[in-house]
Amino acid sequence: MPLEEILSRLPLKSTRAVRSTCKKWDSLFKNRSFISKAAAAREGESQMVVLMDHNLHLVSFFFGSDTSVEIKGKRICLNDDSDSEQVKISQVFHCEGLLLCILKDDNFSLVVWNPYWGQTRWIKPRCSFEIPQGCDMYRYAIGYDNKRRNHKILRFIDYEFHYPRDNVVLWYEIYDFESDLWTTLDVTTPHWLINCGNRGVTLKGNTYWCAKKRNSDLFLNADHIICFDFTSERFGPLLLLPFSDLDGVVTLACVREEKLAALVCHEDVVEVWITIKIEANEVLWSKFLTVNVDLGDEIPSSLTYGSFFIDEEKKVAMIFDKTLDRGDTVHIMGEAGYGGQVDLGEPVNKRRCPLVCSYVPSLVQIKKPAGFQRKQQSKLEKRQYVRNISKLRALKTQSSWTLSMSLECHQQ
């Protein structure tokens, strides 16, 4: 068997050790055509990153001729030293091979990681805002400027507290990898509302969320999607979802970094749609799958709060879920109907559903800070920062929520 074919079949976690063995092999792993060949060598295999019990797992799913599936996976670690205490992760977001990791026990560190290269970049947020039980009130997204391929992180808190009355916490900010600076975005009267806990998915550099009109009924489910354009650093208009009935809860996923998928679960039907055209200001949908299910016996309703994965070629959808009696599970659905579930084991954390995102190895290099070339914050940005911090401090004095601020904020 030729050397290239042998190396192309290596599991991702072994490539770093192999590359360090020989310069010729290292240069081979940097070749784009070789990366494509390696992906093709795994035909029939769907690869994804799954977050369970605050640990990341690189998981491969091998689909049979029907909805049967074989699962193989191992934990992957940010730490190079396997003997050291591993970093615990509370959230993970994916953008073309890069993972944005939100840490469980460190409110003042974000990590961007390329598992293929083993590269990391640690980033300091400017402040942290939590409610009791340690719930991070911020939402996150990672994307890039399509003109310069410069990566950025969007971080925002947009939440209305009913006690104390009439307190709205609203702060959108963006981190630029080139400048190594956080900047407050001009978002003062948003026309959209992204429900707390709603996860965005990044596609072709931009991030999409399920959303609804700002002044709509509090208990109304999301009936639109909205895009944040990392090039213009602005949100687009609300775009309609394709469903005629929105009684079910909707969630989004990315299909091999090419399309967006939307899943809605009603009482007895699961629908999945995928995009045939998607831009910041326009989206067209095509129905991918409709499966009749019996929620009473087979699928618990809590699955709608989990995440899902689509294999477009195999015409299969997998929904990740958590139940009290069975632990973490994957529900398999295809054209033939509901194909049953796969047990992922008993979790330590009984409350959190496993999170999943599709994964394709990437040659993208994570930019490092420019060092002495680093830009200074503008006077306007300093004033905006002080104003937002003052608002959060005022809220803290009226409530039981905890506000803590980094002593290493990027104010110059």
From Swiss-Prot:
Domain F-box: 1-38
InterPro entries in UniProt: F-box-assoc_dom_typ1, F-box-assoc_interact_dom, F-box-like_dom_sf, F-box_dom, SCF_F-box_component
PANTHER family membership: BNACNNG10540D PROTEIN (PTHR31672), F-BOX PROTEIN CPR30-LIKE (PTHR31672:SF13)
Protein name (Swiss-Prot/TrEMBL): Putative F-box protein At3g22940
Species whose genome carries this gene: Arabidopsis thaliana
